[in-house]
Amino acid sequence: MQKYDVKTFQGLILALQDYWAQQGCVIIQPLDMEVGAGTFHPQTFLKSIGPEPMSSAYVQPCRRPTDGRYGENPNRLQHYYQFQVVLKPSPDNIQELYLGSLAAVGIDTLTDEVRFVEDNWESPTLGAWGLGWEIWLNGMEVTQFTYFQQVGGIECSPVTGEITYGLERLAMYIQGVDSIYDLVWADGPLGRVTYGDVFHQNEVEQSTYNFEHANVEDLFAQFDKCEAESQKLIEANLPLPAYEQVMKASHAFNLLDARHAISVTERQRYILRVRALSKACAQSYYDKREALGFPLCKDK
């Protein structure tokens, strides 16, 4: 008998947290800032840099303003959830561990078709790339699997293994529904609550904001301010708050993109500006950890 009701969204999350905790991961809480992917969380981006080991898992709410569809598309959201697993150094049996996690949420890997489709990953704004695969479950992509080669322009040694589950997609498969809004979020003593009950109105209103009301002039000013603040903090040898300003600049850029306020040429220029900040934060973080003697390294 399963410990958690994986046919609910919250039960699926609890089962994944429990499984990865048993594999030795520290269960981290979500970052309290707008990010486009779980990789932006400092626990992935910064902790992948340098020799110090760290394995963690966490849920991360993600915002991608351009993906909003006013709550009318059953498969597209501007706000959704990823479950992120970061294993450093990447263990030799990482694929087996992943397949074990599928079994933990009730998926039979002998009868369900699980395919690893080569799909190398790159994040231009983070100066990061890695060798990887999309993982398809009976024809639906549910996970991205990446071995980080470089983060913030710094070579990864040791290599970090990242597993990113698309929670809504995985839940749709497990629950057998065709619309995200029909997913059962919880089914308890107070009754059944669906994903739509929790988030449909938010999708309608946030899509309206992202596409119609976000103040373009203010967003351009916000980007410039965050960029300047990040540069100042890097000079002050404060890479963590400097990186928070990078994430804020990145979200401002994403909103400008949703408002169609940036031309194709300008778009590349803004991406390069964020990338330069990311790389500066990464180098500053590495230098600071090195000055501390990489304290999380056990073998000295």
Curated annotation (Swiss-Prot):
GO terms for cellular component: cytosol. It catalyses: tRNA(Gly) + glycine + ATP = glycyl-tRNA(Gly) + AMP + diphosphate. Its EC number is 6.1.1.14. Keywords: Aminoacyl-tRNA synthetase, ATP-binding, Cytoplasm, Ligase, Nucleotide-binding, Protein biosynthesis. It is found in: Cytoplasm. It holds the Pfam family tRNA-synt_2e. Belongs to the class-II aminoacyl-tRNA synthetase family. NCBIfam families: glyQ (TIGR00388), PRK09348.1 (NF006827). This is Glycine--tRNA ligase alpha subunit.
